Design a protein with these regions (language model features):
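Conserved hydrolase catalytic core segment
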Residues: 129-169
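Catalytic histidine-centered segment of alpha/beta-hydrolase-like enzymes
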Residues: 291, 297-309
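Short beta-strand/loop motif that positions the catalytic acidic residue
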Residues: 259, 265-267
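An N-terminal hydrophobic leader/cap segment in hydrolases
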Residues: 8-45
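Conserved HGGG/HGGXW glycine-rich cap/lid loop of the alpha/beta-hydrolase fold
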Residues: 57-101
């Protein structure tokens, strides 16, 4: 009798596990389908001498070139620039090398990326624009302004991955590489981690202390979860993420003193990528640059994003009158 009861209990446990697994997989298929549909619309491909470049344009008014960070694509750029669109700017957001529909060429260095940004400006008949580089998009943003200064009206660096003395040999923690290697190859594993290991993803991929998330206003927590969710499908961004990871561990010092354009750099002191020190060093070596730093917020500037957007919009308005570029196609 006892054996029979044990078998029945075991069978019930197995059945519950199967049903639970089917429900989980059903939810995954629904959500990954929605994310794939999201990135499948709203962008175009510009065929340029630098290769095909995916991009999207949103809003009206003065144009701004938005260069996304790691784990991104044109969609991340649009999300980052949503406040700019709301404030009357026209945002051009591309997918950098290895992200979504922009292929990874043999030379995917920040220098080659900077030249590709110029190719996109040419394709869209844009002359001189403000450049916004976020996170791992900062190196190519700086190099765009250094290599092609005639195309850059102003520069904004948001939580920039950049050089600072003593950081050249610094490697990300082992947990970072474990999470990257585990999740990059599988949309399902990343999706699962986003449900059951959010704290780990916040600390590694999003470089934001979990306490900053817990202490942020509701709308900021919703923004953070949206950013985490919209890294899916991560498999469509894998090549770009690996390229950014390689670049980020050995960024050289650029000739910052040669930059002669209005510049603002924004970061948070507890950004786990260390962008506060990097950003402050960068601003200190660009003539007239302004550094805006927050004590908390992490890499996502949680709790300070609205303030940062006000700073950003004000800065861009101040430089708006410097040029009247052509409209993007």
């Amino acid at each position: 009798m006892a054996r029979r009861s044990s078998r029945i209990a075991l069978a019930l446990v197995v059945m519950a596990g199967i049903v639970g697994g089917l429900v989980i997989y059903r939810d995954y298929r629904r959500e990954i389908g929605a994310e794939r549909a999201r990135i499948a619309s709203g962008s175009q491909i510009a065929m340029t001498p630098c290769g095909p470049i995916e991009y999207a344009v949103r809003g009206g008014g003065p144009p701004v070139l938005l260069i996304h960070g790691a784990g991104g694509g044109f969609d991340q750029g649009l999300e980052l620039a949503r406040p700019l669109v709301d404030n009357g700017f026209r945002v051009i957001a591309m997918s950098r090398f290895g992200y979504l529909r922009t292929p990874l060429p043999q030379d995917a260095s920040p220098e080659a990326q900077a030249d590709a940004h110029t190719c996109l400006l040419n394709a869209l008949n844009l002359d001189r624009v403000p450049v916004v580089g976020g996170s791992a998009g900062a190196p190519s943003a700086m190099l765009l302004c250094l290599r092609h200064p005639e195309r850059c009206l102003a520069m904004v660096l948001l939580f920039p991955i950049a050089f600072a003395p003593g950081d050249t040999a610094k490697q990300p923690p082992r947990l970072f590489w474990f999470v990257i290697r585990t999740t990059l190859h599988s949309d399902f594993l990343y999706w699962t981690a986003s449900k059951v290991a959010r704290g780990t993803l916040f600390k590694t991929i999003l470089a934001t202390p979990p306490d900053d998330f817990r202490n942020a206003p509701q709308e900021e927590r919703a923004r953070a979860l949206e950013i985490m969710r919209h890294i899916l499908p991560i498999s469509e961004r894998e090549k770009g993420i690996w390229n950014d990871a390689a670049i980020s561990t050995s960024i050289p010092r650029y000739d910052l003193e040669k930059l002669r354009i209005p510049t603002i750099v924004i970061s948070a002191k507890d950004d786990l990528y260390g962008t506060y020190r990097k950003g402050r060093y960068t601003a200190e070596h660009i003539s007239g640059a302004r550094f805006v730093g927050y004590a908390t917020g992490g890499h996502l500037l949680l709790g300070h994003w609205e303030e940062a957007c006000v700073e950003l919009s004000r800065f861009l308005r101040q430089t708006e009158s410097r040029t009247t570029p052509s409209k993007a196609k």
